[in-house]
């Protein structure tokens, strides 16, 4: 594993039925704000086979501390209230995990 201090944030999201479009439009607005804070969206995935309404994100974040500071930036953004309301309406459940590459994995 390289000496890169970056870690990855694996986000598992379960959407409310029929709210994918609201969620996707809101994420499209919020993602650039996170990227300005040093995050990089490695990929956003929805299963072709598997749990309906699931969405998975993998973000590269500069450090574990960078997660909280970037979320503070999002909370302070002028559109934060609107984003919060859209996510409250569209997300049924969300789980976040900070992960590091394994010794046998190529780092994206």
Q: Each predicted region: which residue ranges?
A:
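Short, well-ordered beta-strand segments in beta-rich or mixed alpha/beta enzyme
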Residues: 7-14, 43-75, 108
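Short amphipathic alpha-helical segments
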Residues: 19-44, 75
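Glycine-rich beta-strand-turn "strand-cap" elements at beta-sheet edges
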Residues: 1-4, 40-56, 81-108
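Vicinal oxygen chelate
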Residues: 63-65, 79-84
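Functionally engaged cysteine thiol sites
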Residues: 34, 59, 93
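Residue-level signal for secondary-structure boundary sites
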Residues: 19-21, 65-67, 104-106
């Amino acid at each position: 594993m390289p000496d890169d201090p970056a870690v990855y944030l694996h986000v598992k999201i379960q959407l409310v039925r029929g709210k994918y479009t609201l969620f996707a439009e809101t994420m499209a607005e919020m993602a650039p704000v996170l990227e300005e804070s040093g995050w990089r969206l490695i990929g956003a995935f929805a299963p072709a086979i598997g749990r309906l309404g699931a969405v998975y994100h993998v973000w590269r974040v500069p450090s574990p501390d960078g997660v909280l500071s970037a979320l503070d930036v999002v909370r302070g953004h002028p559109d934060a209230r609107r984003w919060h309301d859209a996510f409250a309406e569209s997300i049924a459940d969300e789980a976040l995990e900070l992960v590091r590459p394994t010794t046998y994995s190529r780092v994206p």
